[in-house]
Amino acid sequence: MEDQVILVDENDTEIGVEGKMIAHRSGSLHRAISIFIFDSADRLLLQKRAASKYHSAGLWSNTCCSHPRPREECARAARRRLREEMGIACELDVKFGFVYRAVLTNHLIENEFDHVFFGRHDGDPVPNPDEAEDWKWVDLAWLRADLNERPHAYSFWLEACIDRVIACREEDRTRVA
């Protein structure tokens, strides 16, 4: 049976479920999660999506992204997928949500209400090769500059939210100081 995604309205109110590929072909708005893991040096862990992924293959992206299953809370889905994709277990905090829509190169449509989580982890990930073919720790200022120079090398959703991610990190540092 095909994986299901949770259909939502613009307020993130659940309105149904649909097959994942059907939702991505039709452009149905559905719930998603994006995880950003930082180390103690405040570097962000990026993953390079596996060449076998059904969309955005071979692109650099945030640490982990996926969809919660029907009846699964976003926080639980985020912890589950972070372990499955990158072999990391850590505390995650939800930071914000945003909606984005993009028509991808293979005519699939990303139309997601994305819940963004931050976590902290020091050490190397153990990526699932079906999900990620490479990884690296990067400075956020470097990433912002590289996204400006080479947007084609990154996932659309990373570009869509990176400025808000950077602003949240600045707020977090200000609160701690």
Swiss-Prot record:
CC terms in the record's Gene Ontology section: cytoplasm
Listed CDD domains: NUDIX_IPP_Isomerase
Positions annotated to bind Mn(2+): 24, 30, 67, 110, 112
UniProt GO molecular function: isopentenyl-diphosphate delta-isomerase activity; metal ion binding
Superkingdom of the source species: Bacteria
Catalytic machinery residues: 65, 112
Pfam families: NUDIX (PF00293)
Binding-site list for Mg(2+): 65, 85
PANTHER family (alphabetical): ISOPENTENYL-DIPHOSPHATE DELTA-ISOMERASE
Family annotation (NCBIfam families): IPP_isom_1, PRK03759.1
Protein name stated in the entry: Isopentenyl-diphosphate Delta-isomerase 1
Classification lineage: Bacteria, Pseudomonadati, Pseudomonadota, Betaproteobacteria, Rhodocyclales
Gene responsible for this protein: idi1
